[in-house]
Amino acid sequence: MWVLMSWLAFAAGLVAGTQCPDGQFCPVACCLDQGGANYSCCNPLLDTWPRITSHHLDGSCQTHGHCPAGYSCLLTVSGTSSCCPFSKGVSCGDGYHCCPQGFHCSADGKSCFQMSDNPLGAVQCPGSQFECPDSATCCIMVDGSWGCCPMPQASCCEDRVHCCPHGASCDLVHTRCVSPTGTHTLLKKFPAQKTNRAVSLPFSVVCPDAKTQCPDDSTCCELPTGKYGCCPMPNAICCSDHLHCCPQDTVCDLIQSKCLSKNYTTDLLTKLPGYPVKEVKCDMEVSCPEGYTCCRLNTGAWGCCPFAKAVCCEDHIHCCPAGFQCHTEKGTCEMGILQVPWMKKVIAPLRLPDPQILKSDTPCDDFTRCPTNNTCCKLNSGDWGCCPIPEAVCCSDNQHCCPQGFTCLAQGYCQKGDTMVAGLEKIPARQTTPLQIGDIGCDQHTSCPVGQTCCPSLKGSWACCQLPHAVCCEDRQHCCPAGYTCNVKARTCEKDVDFIQPPVLLTLGPKVGNVECGEGHFCHDNQTCCKDSAGVWACCPYLKGVCCRDGRHCCPGGFHCSARGTKCLRKKIPRWDMFLRDPVPRPLL
């Protein structure tokens, strides 16, 4: 039987698995071998499918003609090609084994499973609605739907019809794939299948955004879109192009498209899409990870069983996979002749783990921080910047940095012996100054002054739109007033209805502020001083706002007040402007 697991420990990677009676650890469960003397790792759901032993890859090749008769030449995850003793084989993720076509590799690559309907070993395409067979790659088709390239880590060609092996580039002019080892024929993609996934594979790597997760033994890396993808190896190095990654203890060389280390050189790896973090809600406060089942504990609290649609045992301590029965006297889950031992439960947490717990920052000083595994380096401005590798060498130009052991050269290069790589560009560090009272919080580290709106910027950080409740435009450079739509092509803010906007009530001005009104009264920065109906200075929460005659309301710049001051009428189409600027935390006095 299975114990209910903690989502916090699960997400933080603290759950090492199940310890078998012989001392070994397994990710899901332990099963007795046929002889009954030894234990091996198993998954009761996977073990009900047809199973055969995988074969070792043997000998390098470039085409099927380089392999013995009945063998196939397969591309491995490391970028090399090897002979598989099946006429139509599938390369396993460990890079050393292969399975026949129609089968899927086990996690350790030593077994092949033949699965029907929707195999768990399938590659899930972004959006989680379509999937490709194991050892395939998701690529966009001509019609915008998802297609499958029949090899792992493939390169998707720009024509949206063809693809090339990992490490090769598409030469559409000559209809071929070009790689350092030679040329290959372009491969055609086939349509992806609709996902009908009943059970999810366990994920134990939650990315810093707390919205994306990656499989165990992989690494979260940021993609060009700002979202997170998965590098298919643990403790990987995320390359600065946001497309590739390299093994641990290597350096990304984007000029040569290689991963460099002291002893060897390998091809860059392409990141895979991450999976959305989803929850199974037990009640309004407690949830379990996707693919788990909520079960009550003896205390009445909720616990998490690591299988979808699981059977909760009557002892309120254990659970079994779907289709199994709880045998509390034996302490097993049984389905026919198959028996597996049980484990103990733990309490389900109240919420998802805080991403700041999973990924601690690197402090530069008391007020500035860089992401984990980064190095703090000074910028030309004198502020702190972040070099995206640990223990880096900060170059004297205050723009670049180099890996540990390398020397900074002119024009942004790094050298170590005969090896030369491109230097990495620093990014601005995050300010950790706490929010001032009244400021608008963008995230844990950044805020905008009151009366403004946080908008994402081109740099991937936050910027401030100098309008309250504004609409942030898709180009990440502009913003429009609330209720308007950005027309990026026409560079205008548009509204389908009439040119009317409700006015804003004035607030009494403080004694101290940034904008001097007179008579000892001030308003905050990006506000406008207006006299109220009593003749006392008050503050309009718009920069260059228009004061209404009623002494109670005001309108944004570019509008004028109606006769009664109950409406803001637009004089003309709002001017497209560069509203965004860098956010600066300010005290409100």
Swiss-Prot record:
GO terms for cellular component: cerebellar climbing fiber to Purkinje cell synapse; endoplasmic reticulum; extracellular region; extracellular space; Golgi apparatus; late endosome; lysosomal membrane; lysosome. InterPro entries: Granulin, Granulin_fam, Granulin_sf. Glycans are attached at N38, N263, N373, N526. This is Progranulin. Residues 1-17 form the signal peptide. The gene is Grn. It is found in: Secreted; Lysosome. N-glycosylated. Progranulin is secreted as a homodimer. Interacts with SLPI; interaction protects progranulin from proteolysis. Interacts (via region corresponding to granulin-7 peptide) with CTSD; stabilizes CTSD and increases its proteolytic activity. Interacts (via region corresponding to granulin-7 peptide) with SORT1; this interaction mediates endocytosis and lysosome delivery of progranulin; interaction occurs at the neuronal cell surface in a stressed nervous system. Interacts with PSAP; facilitates lysosomal delivery of progranulin from the extracellular space and the biosynthetic pathway. Keywords: Cytokine, Disulfide bond, Glycoprotein, Lysosome, Repeat, Secreted, Signal. Disruption phenotype: Young-adult knockout mice are healthy and fertile, grow normally and show no abnormalities in hematogram or serum chemistries. However they show increased inflammation levels, impaired host defense, and neuropathology. Knockout animals displays neuronal outgrowth deficit. They exhibit increased neuron death and microglial activation upon central nervous system injury (CNS). Conditional knockout mice exhibit a reduction in dopaminergic neurons and increased microgliosis after CNS injury. The keyword Signal applies.
